[in-house]
Regions:
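Conserved short histidine dyad/triad with adjacent acidic residue
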Residues: 17-19, 31-50
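A short, N-terminal "cap"/entry segment at the start of jelly-roll beta-barrel domains
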Residues: 1-29, 42, 112-128
Length: 128
């Protein structure tokens, strides 16, 4: 998958450099997102009145996804993680690895994204 362009439009919601490659915006919007080591996005929520949520498919490297109140889950190439709608979460690269995932927006009604606070170094550095 293409790496895409620097993710400048959303840089304020990331710690570190990421790149974004839109693959399709029809039916199920899908993007390839690439993270340099230690890069992660802020906590955020994919809101939906009905349906919605997000699916991550790791295609390269190693990264993390964490739902609020749960332990972080390691993602490796070929693994899929489903994020339910209306759940606060974050995702990003491992400390020592690049990370690339496909991000699929699950269709729904009344969908919107809410960006929240950064994942601090204190929280991130506790990951193995």
């Amino acid at each position: 998958f293409p790496v895409g362009k620097p993710n400048d439009a959303y840089a304020k919601y990331f710690i570190g450099q990421s790149w974004l490659a839109p693959l399709t915006t029809k039916q199920v919007p899908t993007h390839n997102v690439t993270f340099e080591p230690r890069c992660r996005n802020n906590w955020h929520i994919h809101h939906a009145e009905k349906g919605g949520g997000q699916m991550l498919i790791c295609v390269y490297g190693r990264g993390w996804v964490q739902l609020e109140g749960e332990p972080a889950h390691e993602l490796k190439a070929g693994e899929v993680f489903n994020i339910p709608p209306n759940v606060k979460h974050w995702h990003g690269a491992a400390k020592d690895s690049w990370f690339q995932h496909l991000s699929l927006e699950v269709p729904g009604e009344g969908t919107s994204n809410e960006w929240l606070e950064p994942v601090t170094d204190e929280v991130y550095d506790k990951l193995p």
